[in-house]
Amino acid sequence: HSGYDWLLVDCQHGPMEPVTMSAMLCAIQNGGAKSMVRVAGYDDRNGIQQALDLGADGILIPYINTAEEAAAGVSCCLYPFGKAGTRSVYFPQRSMNKQGLLGYAGGNNDNVLIALQVETADCIKNMEAICAVPRVDLLFLGQNDLCVSMGLFDGKYDFPAMYTSPELEAATAKLIKCATEKDILLGMFQFGTDRVTEFLDKGFNFISVGNDLHHVLTQSFAHKEALV
């Protein structure tokens, strides 16, 4: 109810199990926002299935390195209509609501948002091939892991200088170019709003500005400073 367009439920780093995820997805829908679930990886078929069956509007697949991995992850998100994917059909399930099996499954392939996380040097290297995979809807830049993968945080740059390094700028530019050529949306993680305008101007329109712990800590520190 705070006005965010979308919220991410993190099953990669967060201590999450299906019952908790289900409750969070219900709360997000009730608040009027859209939901995206980050799963463990492209081969987390069960995690992708559970998230979509429980009503996730989108799936974020981390640690993509190759077009083959991208295609495998996409396949798990889509029902096999027209051989589009390999998602299992089950009835009834929460995500169907009142639509019924055909009402939900028949249109879900067009409605689910499939996002791949760009966070490795190999992903940047293979970006053209990854962007050519059908039904990659969104490419989500993960700067932390990408900097580590590129060797930028191993004594080369101090934190947070790695975020403005020429190497990361070049990788980001390649991501933007390849995604734009294929009409793929761009997203990214940010902690705070200092650089949001900069990345909006670069074409990123799907931006996270923090997680729950970040929000709690930021507001807690602000209250403390206001009282001393």
Locate each region found by the language model.
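Expand to "…catalyze enediolate/carbanion chemistry for C-C bond making/breaking, isomerization
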Residues: 1-228
